[in-house]
């Protein structure tokens, strides 16, 4: 599925589903994965899909292309990153799951980054949805991540301290996204 932002797209909140929706104006509707309690007050008001939204979407999509994933998943991750950037309430960092990175990189918006789990040193992929001075709001860019106290699924948000993030290198990708979906 290839989607192209359009000036007829619009954001609205669906009271029945308690989710932010994006009307794609072609009979398709994208439903955000974030529950109502995570969304800011502006998410509950209808608004147009702006030129800035389109620019962010294309920025996320371009960076996500580094990861071996189907176009549907790429669009889902890009749209959820855009929603996280625009409409998510602030989150507190939860960096205790990850090792401090030895490479000093300054994360940038829409960057695909990796981090290593403290207990296993397993590499984990995230997409930077929002950059902060000390920490970034990131979305999980792989099918699943088992942590010691919970399991994250694709597109789940986590705020991570910048010193835990490192530049993603394709050859170090832990597994193919396509095979994870099949198994």
Curated annotation (Swiss-Prot):
Main site of residence?
Answer: cytoplasm
Family matches, as InterPro entries: ZapC (IPR009809), ZapC_C (IPR048372), ZapC_N (IPR048373)
Q: Which GO terms describe its biological process?
A: division septum assembly; FtsZ-dependent cytokinesis
The yes or no answer to whether the keyword Cytoplasm is present is: yes
One GO CC term, this protein:
cytoplasm
Keyword Ribosomal protein assigned: no
Give the matching Pfam families: ZapC_C (PF07126), ZapC_N (PF21083)
Q: Which key words are in the record?
A: Cell cycle, Cell division, Cytoplasm, Septation
Q: How does it assemble?
A: Interacts directly with FtsZ.
Subcellular location, record wording: Cytoplasm
Q: What is the lineage of its organism?
A: Bacteria, Pseudomonadati, Pseudomonadota, Gammaproteobacteria, Enterobacterales
State its role: Contributes to the efficiency of the cell division process by stabilizing the polymeric form of the cell division protein FtsZ. Acts by promoting interactions between FtsZ protofilaments and suppressing the GTPase activity of FtsZ.
Name used for this protein in its record: Cell division protein ZapC
Protein's organism:
Proteus mirabilis (strain HI4320)
Q: Which family does it belong to?
A: Belongs to the ZapC family.
